[in-house]
Amino acid sequence: MPKRKIQRERPKEKFSYDPRKVLKMLDEHARRILEDIKAGKNPHFDIPMRGLSNVYFDEKSRLIKMGDKLSRRYFLNVAHARKFMQTLLIMAYVKRLVSEGKHASLREAYYANKHTIPGTRENTFEDQSESDPIIEDLERMFGVLREEMHITADRRGYIYGDIVIRDGEDEFNASRLGSGGWAVPGTVEHIQFPEINVDYALVVETAAMADRLIEEKFPKRENALIIATQGQASRGVRRLIHRLHYEEGLPIIVFTDGDPYGWYIYSTIKQGSINLAYLSDKLATPESKFVGMTMDDIKKYGLENVTEKLKGIPPNKKGGPTGDYKRILEEMNYPWFQNKEWQRQLQLALKWGVRIEQQALANKSLEFVAKEYLPEKINNGDLLP
């Protein structure tokens, strides 16, 4: 076997979780509002605008970022007053959560702040679709994750490997919790890693493939940490990946299905997403590499008979492109896929009209992916940028 090329790097960031910074920002904004009221001014919030018009790809940092366009929300404005009130309500709720060391889900945050305004028939919130955007506004205003404000989403994803995790007063090794590993919580800001005995992290799209690798002893034999995203990576998983790379120096290798959905999962982990452009510097990991599945794998490993047809209408047919074909053409225009390696893969997918799943490797044998496919590609540096 060739000499391993994957090894830990020098950390670029330090563990920096500090609830006090959120409390400080809340206090500063609240004091400014109070001062405006005392001075007879119209209180306002300046909030970075959401939407495509305020999003760009930064070539230097290789991240999808938010621009500098702002929208101003006034108290003494009929069109703004309701959202202004809702913003202050959520700010007060966040202060209480952080001060008391408690966490709440998005749904709990909605219900906790929903009530009828005294003397009226008006509710503060009618639906969670009103409270969620306010929380996103605060993220953009403060430049922090909602998880740092102690507001969480449902947990999804798990890790397995020789890494010691400290979660509050608990400390445990993620390779000694059974084959199910450690479920990644919605909030990972407070998690610390006293001991890491792996060379790199392998991010795996499907739980079935992650389970296969664990059963075949891949993490122990290859000295790797398995991170199962279970589909599109959650915010908690993306933040964990970012922290493991920048704070602990772990190289990140991504393993997904060879289809437009899998490639988008990789894109989101690597460059961030348009919807969360304001958090790319906390969630994205531009140094990530892609091991597969690729179109080249189909012929190299004799998988022609286990491919699946792309869904939709090809661009050269009436009514096309639609479905997978349309998505691939969109991905070909992503700035971060504007290199010959990725253009080749996407063009081959269009030309052949096929997709290839991770589980297709079982056609060779159940252990093939763990004992041949991944070790060969990773140790040979056969990775896409």
Swiss-Prot record:
<dbReference type="InterPro" id="IPR034136">
    <property type="entry name" value="TOPRIM_Topo6A/Spo11"/>
</dbReference>
<dbReference type="GO" id="GO:0006265">
    <property type="term" value="P:DNA topological change"/>
</dbReference>
<dbReference type="GO" id="GO:0003677">
    <property type="term" value="F:DNA binding"/>
</dbReference>
<keyword id="KW-0479">Metal-binding</keyword>
<dbReference type="InterPro" id="IPR002815">
    <property type="entry name" value="Spo11/TopoVI_A"/>
</dbReference>
<dbReference type="InterPro" id="IPR036388">
    <property type="entry name" value="WH-like_DNA-bd_sf"/>
</dbReference>
<keyword id="KW-0067">ATP-binding</keyword>
<feature type="active site" description="O-(5'-phospho-DNA)-tyrosine intermediate">
    <location>
        <position position="111"/>
    </location>
</feature>
<feature type="binding site">
    <location>
        <position position="257"/>
    </location>
    <ligand>
        <name>Mg(2+)</name>
    </ligand>
</feature>
<dbReference type="GO" id="GO:0003918">
    <property type="term" value="F:DNA topoisomerase type II (double strand cut, ATP-hydrolyzing) activity"/>
</dbReference>
<dbReference type="InterPro" id="IPR013049">
    <property type="entry name" value="Spo11/TopoVI_A_N"/>
</dbReference>
<feature type="domain" description="Topo IIA-type catalytic">
    <location>
        <begin position="17"/>
        <end position="158"/>
    </location>
</feature>
<dbReference type="GO" id="GO:0005524">
    <property type="term" value="F:ATP binding"/>
</dbReference>
<dbReference type="Pfam" id="PF04406">
    <property type="entry name" value="TP6A_N"/>
</dbReference>
<keyword id="KW-0547">Nucleotide-binding</keyword>
<dbReference type="InterPro" id="IPR004085">
    <property type="entry name" value="TopoVI_A"/>
</dbReference>
<protein>
    <recommendedName>
        <fullName>Type 2 DNA topoisomerase 6 subunit A</fullName>
        <ecNumber>5.6.2.2</ecNumber>
    </recommendedName>
</protein>
<comment type="function">
    <text>Relaxes both positive and negative superturns and exhibits a strong decatenase activity.</text>
</comment>
<dbReference type="Pfam" id="PF21180">
    <property type="entry name" value="TOP6A-Spo11_Toprim"/>
</dbReference>
<keyword id="KW-0238">DNA-binding</keyword>
<keyword id="KW-0413">Isomerase</keyword>
<feature type="binding site">
    <location>
        <position position="205"/>
    </location>
    <ligand>
        <name>Mg(2+)</name>
    </ligand>
</feature>
<comment type="subunit">
    <text>Homodimer. Heterotetramer of two Top6A and two Top6B chains.</text>
</comment>
<keyword id="KW-0460">Magnesium</keyword>
<dbReference type="InterPro" id="IPR036078">
    <property type="entry name" value="Spo11/TopoVI_A_sf"/>
</dbReference>
<dbReference type="GO" id="GO:0005694">
    <property type="term" value="C:chromosome"/>
</dbReference>
<comment type="similarity">
    <text>Belongs to the TOP6A family.</text>
</comment>
<keyword id="KW-0799">Topoisomerase</keyword>
<dbReference type="GO" id="GO:0000287">
    <property type="term" value="F:magnesium ion binding"/>
</dbReference>
